[in-house]
């Protein structure tokens, strides 16, 4: 499963060769999907809609944050988790992990494929970090193609990670 995650990542943008990262850096890991195995697993995981799950409900699973932290720590870097993107010491770069809420069947029906159409909270985090001259890598979690032009334009690097399930470490690899 971890190898499948590695091989299914789609790099949509990589300005100034920001990726691969230098994990010895001070890295902020932000976004509501960074440490959320339920969100990275999608619908039909534990519960029908894949909602109201905790990381502890997935024994042996690794969140994207946990996978990144392992890589960063082993390289002598520092990983700081902040779902809202706030920090006390300016990071060298930020990885923002965001995406769709889990869904199954009709609950996932949309009349428009624009991501966060009426509430651009993820875009706000990206723009706030960019305004502070922090390079931003976006990791987008989704079970289907979505219109993310605004988020793509607000990022220095952008990775479509689809639904990595329990193997968040595959994104860090």
Predicted segments with their positions:
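C-terminal non-catalytic regions of proteins with extracellular/luminal or membrane-system context
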Residues: 2-173
């Amino acid at each position: 499963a971890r190898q499948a995650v590695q091989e299914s990542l789609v790099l949509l943008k990589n300005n100034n060769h920001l990726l691969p990262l230098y994990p010895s850096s001070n890295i902020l890991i932000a976004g509501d999907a960074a440490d959320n195995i339920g969100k990275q697993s999608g619908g039909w995981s534990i519960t029908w809609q894949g909602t109201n799950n905790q990381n502890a409900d997935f024994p042996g699973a690794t969140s994207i944050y946990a996978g990144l932290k392992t890589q960063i720590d082993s390289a002598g870097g520092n990983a700081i988790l902040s779902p809202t993107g706030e920090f006390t010491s300016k990071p060298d770069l930020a990885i923002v992990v965001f995406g769709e809420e889990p869904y199954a069947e009709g609950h996932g029906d949309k009349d428009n494929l624009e991501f966060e159409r009426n509430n651009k909270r993820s875009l706000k985090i990206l723009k706030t970090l960019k305004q502070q001259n922090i390079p931003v890598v976006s990791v987008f979690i989704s079970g289907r193609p979505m219109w993310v032009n605004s988020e793509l334009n607000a990022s220095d690097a952008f990775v479509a990670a689809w639904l990595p399930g329990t193997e968040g470490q595959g994104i860090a690899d």
